[in-house]
Amino acid sequence: RRRRSQGSEVNLTGQGQPCHSCGERCPGFLAHKWRKICQHCQCPWEEHGHTASNQDLERSLCRLVSGSQRDSLCDSSSDSSVEKYAWVPSGLNPVQVHHFFKCFPEKKIPYINSPGEKYRLKQLLHQLPPHDSEARYCCSLQGEEEEELLLLFSQKRRLENLGRGCVRPISGTMSGTVCQQCGHQINVGEVAVFASRAGLGFCWHPQCFTCAQCLELLCDLIYFYQDGKVYCGRHHAELKRPRCLACDEVIFSLECTQAEGFHWHTRHFCCFECECPLGGQRYIMKDQRPFCCSCYERLYAQYCDSCGECIGIDEGQLTYGGQHWHASESCFCCGRCGECLLGRPFLPRHGQIYCSRSCSMLHTKSERPFSPSQMDLSFQKETKDVGTSTNHELEGDSITNCTLAGSRTSLSVIDQTPTQAAPARSLHSSLRGAPKGFSRECPNRRSLPDLSSHTRTPTRVTFQLPSHSEIKESISFSRPSFTSSSSSDEEEGYFLGEPIPLPPFLRSPGYTAPPTHVPTSTRKQKKKKDKSCFLS
């Protein structure tokens, strides 16, 4: 009688082999004692390299499936014109081989030392699991009885269902042949795949010869025929017997555990992290892997964006836009007034949620300060994350409309040089100082700068009308006569003889507009100048 193998004696994937999926993140394959995964990256063993040569691996897998080394299953063409391929269908000339592989995506063509060759080897290990055919690759068989069941299972599948597709061009006598997969006609002269177990005249396009379950190309044209469909070895075995989700082996024991549409050996139904038994216990499935409650909370629990505490698996959770909250009145509430938002519409803004637009505007009305050199940014750049701001860029001598905290204020900025926009420091000296109603707590929004801390000599501003060629829009005046002023005869705070009032958003409580009269001496001087001033 054969001695039962422990599974660790034979392994097609050698220790330390690199992972094709993780790359350098995985230090190398380290076999789990009974799972078919790497302990480092937790990827399946077929994702890693192998110690055998390509030809030895191919022949080994074919032997596991067929029980012999028949040429029809293992030998490939030795023509020198097709040596660039790791495998080719037998019986084809180089031109037909080229037409056959032209039907496949580039990344799946098995050129030597290419991604297509790695894909082929990976699919051989996945579609034809060696532990489905030989006990020496298994680690979960209990006793010689289960080993005998595996042997009978493998022999019956090989005799009744196993086959390998044959590729040949469609001849003139077979015109009108239809693909069994897509239903489209295969033209005369095109290559097609024939499966003898399906019957005479049944054929497929090369790209349509896929497993009926996983829809992957049948590697090396090896198929298992069942009830009018072709399957890969893995999924055909699952039609006959359940497969353990943990160890990836076919279950031959009398009892097994079934949950979430999957099966396990009874002893293998355990936490993926700590491997504690889960029979009769609460568990959570994540990515088709069961976890106990404590491991799941430690690895995957989310934290509430309101209180910062961990959200337990027994607590209600609300999720929106990558944020998480406890489903409680104290956590899922308006960030301004604290009103509960459970079952109500809400407005997300700046990582907070609000019950209304007014609350969101009040909470974002005050923003962090910025230096005077950044003042031009507040008028020229659009703040995209603030829904209440609409800013427009300065264009020459045009009027710039800036909306701050929901109130629209128009500022007229005219530069002394007609071809450039007004510099930020050429604002009137009456604009110094931040208004009292603004705070600077929110870091995501700009507000007016605090210029009171910057001690500097008040800048005297001289306003000058643009020349006739520079005026983009018609200008109307309410006074019948006017005069151009200069820094020598215009009093500060006045422009063209009229007082300059503060903008509404800069007016402090109790603000009174400046007097509308000007000194008598100044008025007399202007009247004298009016006589000699004219418009061209």
UniProtKB/Swiss-Prot annotation:
Bias-annotated ranges (Polar residues): 450-467
Keyword tags: Cell membrane, Cilium biogenesis/degradation, Cytoplasm, Developmental protein, LIM domain, Membrane, Metal-binding, Mitochondrion, Repeat, Zinc
Biased composition (Low complexity): 474-487
Every PET domain range: 66-175
Main location: cytoplasm
Top-level taxonomic group: Eukaryota
Segments of this protein annotated with the region Disordered: 418-536
Membrane topology: Peripheral membrane protein
GO biological process, one term: cell projection organization
PANTHER family: LIM DOMAIN-CONTAINING PROTEIN, PRICKLE PLANAR CELL POLARITY PROTEIN 3
Name of the molecule in the record: Prickle planar cell polarity protein 3-B
